[in-house]
Amino acid sequence: MKKLIVTADDYGYTKAINEGIIRAVTEGIVTDIALMVLTDPEDLEHGLKLLKDHNLNEVGLHTSLFHWGKTERPGRGDFIKFFKEASDNEIEKRALSEIAEFERLVGAKPKFISPQFNMHGNLRLLKIMAKYVVANNIPMRIPRALIEIEEITDSNYSAEIYLKRLGVKMTNHLYAHILGADTEAIKQSFLHELGSVQDDESVEIILHPGYNDQITLESSSLNYERARDLSLALDPIFSKNIQDLGYTFSHMSSLWSQK
């Protein structure tokens, strides 16, 4: 049986995104939530309350390193500049501080680690995160090439091999279609990709479901795409198509039972 994990990124960013993701989990195919903890306190607390109210525990850390809020949002250039100029100690301090904040807020270690902007493609950061996940038996998202483009199609074989040698658990495949207005075309692309997976392999699909309010429209680079992904997550035909391909919906935390 093939495993499919469907992760909703950007939880905690705005209330509208929080509410859309909760619906995508409780009524749709989303299995795991990637939580940002360096967001505006009001939006973060709103998200944490919803997790508690709905008894949702499959929550991982969506590493961002910088504060993301209504009036402050880093761009790719900020990350490139940071990794170019920061010392190893500065990167480690910022990364471990963010992990500690997740543990403090959630009251548990993250069920998985995933990055904003593919930043785990930076090998200095990757080594820090790998040390943490190995020590705590936590899966990671497959690393991709670093933050140069919106899509995450570029493989990062050196980073993958490094993690595999350490014994870090990852899915066998990672699929995402971040941009695009044609919902049906994206659905068919996902199904085509899923159809190529071998039995007993695992896949993570990344979605960005959410509602749009004024704050989200003004502060996020993804707007229509969030409504599109919420529609995909709630589509019963899409869910059935996936199951007809031999998939069972699972969680990142289940990867520790995967050989």
Protein language model annotation of sequence segments:
Residues 1-5, 15-57, 63-106, 112, ...:
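Terminal accessory/targeting
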Residues 8-11:
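DG-centered beta-turn motif at the end of beta-strands
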Residues 117-122:
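Gly/Ser/Thr-rich loops at beta-strand to alpha-helix junctions
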